[in-house]
């Protein structure tokens, strides 16, 4: 059973990995280990994520000293007790320039329970993430494909909204805003800038349907 710390004031919001990691190299085939420690909250214990990755030199550009990284496994512990291990298949991931794979921990369903994400692909214009969220019944993290959409994802904890921005090439950009309704993600706003006619168009959820509510000059010209 997980031990919960109910006497702390830490708010579970997205936590960037760069402030809380340690790293060590292991001799096996260019593998390395990054450890990410996150504090306890009222609903989650303090956790240590031990991420094992493999790096290989980028042989396509001899002029750059650059490495690509692939995730191997993720070991999750609390108070030194293993609660879960995830084994990754390299074929499910594109080469990543980041050795931490953009790891981020946060309350991605705004329910007080933790979750984490890592990059699945960062090679194109829009990153793609894999998400896991805490399942209180299973006492483990489970894959959460509802959030696995292409684009840059930002969690607005004040408004409990999820904002996704993506580029379609050229001046075309799309900005999506989601909210949860009974644990289901609902698209409540869609902004296209610029559309084929060079306009910025705003669509909002009205009576269960996205409807065009505003058309202005593009802000990206």
Where would I find each of the regions flagged by the language model?
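A short, structured loop/turn motif at beta-sheet edges
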Residues: 109-111, 135-140, 154-157, 180-184
